[in-house]
């Protein structure tokens, strides 16, 4: 049986996705060297340098990584300097997790301390668990204790990320209330006075989707422990086109793919389609039915990347509206028959009318009709 490639023979450069602190190590080093501002206790960079890392700095050759609401980034950084946790809420695909990763990488140098909220998340996942072999052999001890990411963050004075917190049952969410208020964790198995005190620099960044299934409302007591920031979809058309093109180039370059000709007007067509189906309104103000499916910028990049791969390997290396139409099915055809009807209506009316005046839109319409019969 093949065991695949051993970890030692797999260089980090071949990793599908590196953590931000590894991917942008050179940028972080330049920011650290040039950072003359005061740093909060436990922070790797000053607040100004954290902002530069996320929003970019041409002088230091630091790339922009988060697009959209710059003041939101400032407020998030300020929140993390205080005693409140940071709650990033918004629709799926609006880069909440990306922003939390970037903040953790810049502030703590470690974005990997993460609790993933699910229906199966238990108190042990938030606090600590035990190595039961050692527990049976030695009894309760520090050696037998298995620290959770939150425990490690408290001990080291770092940020911990809590992804999709509203997927956890309410009684599990509320475990955080005392931890965030008292900044200490009781460990009764190690003695009546055993406790872990959070070190300076510790805080929590949580994310929650506003429009998703299988979520639980947070208690008002827990909400009071967080400052809420809403991450909204990008509304500026040209800005979103530039972002999708930049992300697509990064994906193609990172995947080692041969060059693909990506016309801007094809990406603009994709972004227009996503924005109109997301907003339930066309560019000229005509009201249409929006979709239940997530039509985020991240999904647009996924569609563009899949279409570019199809163009490269099957259709001569030039991305056209034909590939976009084919890959759009994967976004819409998930679990909503109503969405399929709405998209067909969109193609039969809006796209068809534009196709009378524009060759790309005609290709888009004809390809979609052939695929979506």
Language model region names:
Residues 2-257:
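AAA+ P-loop NTPase catalytic core and its hallmark functional loops
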Residues 23, 49, 149, 239, ...:
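Exposed alpha-helical structural elements
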Residues 46, 122, 146, 161, ...:
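A diffuse structural propensity rather than consistent per-protein peaks
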Residues 70, 248-319:
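Conserved AAA+ ATPase small/helical "lid" subdomain
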Residues 76, 270, 274, 327-328:
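Short alpha-helical scaffolding segments that buttress acidic/His motifs in well-ordered protein cores
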Residues 99, 276, 330-334:
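A short structural micro-motif
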Residues 225, 243, 306-310, 327:
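A general alpha-helix detector
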Residues 312-373:
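C-terminal engagement/docking regions of AAA+ P-loop ATPases
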């Amino acid at each position: 049986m093949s065991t695949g490639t051993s970890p030692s023979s797999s260089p980090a450069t071949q990793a599908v996705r590196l953590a931000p602190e590894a991917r942008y190590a050179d940028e972080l080093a330049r920011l650290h060297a040039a950072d003359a501002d005061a740093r909060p206790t436990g922070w790797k960079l000053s607040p100004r340098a954290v902002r530069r890392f996320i929003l970019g700095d041409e002088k230091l050759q630091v790339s922009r990584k988060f697009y959209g609401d710059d003041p939101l980034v400032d407020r998030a950084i300020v929140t993390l300097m205080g005693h409140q946790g940071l709650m990033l809420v918004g629709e799926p695909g609006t880069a909440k997790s990306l922003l939390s990763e970037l903040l953790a990488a810049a502030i703590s140098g470690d974005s990997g301390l993460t609790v993933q909220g699910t229906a199966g998340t238990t108190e042990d996942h938030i606090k600590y668990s035990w190595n039961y072999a050692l527990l049976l052999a030695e009894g309760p001890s520090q050696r037998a204790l298995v620290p959770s990411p939150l425990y490690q963050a408290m001990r080291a004075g770092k940020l911990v990320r809590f992804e999709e917190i509203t997927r956890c049952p309410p009684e599990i969410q509320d475990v955080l209330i005392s931890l965030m208020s008292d900044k200490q964790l009781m460990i009764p198995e190690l003695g009546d006075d055993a406790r872990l005190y959070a070190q300076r620099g510790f805080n929590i960044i949580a994310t929650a989707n506003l429009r998703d299934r299988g979520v639980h409302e947070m208690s008002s007591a827990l909400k009071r422990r967080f400052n809420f920031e809403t991450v909204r979809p990008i509304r500026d058309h040209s800005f979103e086109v530039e972002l999708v093109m930049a992300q697509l180039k990064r994906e193609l370059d990172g995947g080692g793919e041969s060059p693909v000709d990506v016309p801007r007007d094809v990406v603009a067509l994709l972004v227009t389609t996503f924005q109109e189906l997301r907003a339930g309104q066309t560019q000229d103000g005509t009201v249409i039915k929006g979709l239940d499916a997530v039509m985020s910028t991240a999904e647009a990049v996924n569609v563009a990347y899949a279409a570019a791969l199809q163009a490269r390997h099957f259709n001569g290396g030039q991305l056209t509206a034909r590939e976009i139409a084919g890959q759009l099915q994967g976004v819409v055809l998930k679990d909503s028959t109503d969405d399929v009807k709405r998209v067909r209506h969109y193609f039969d009316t809006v796209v068809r009318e534009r196709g009378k005046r524009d060759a790309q839109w005609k290709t888009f319409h004809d390809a979609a009709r052939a695929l979506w019969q």
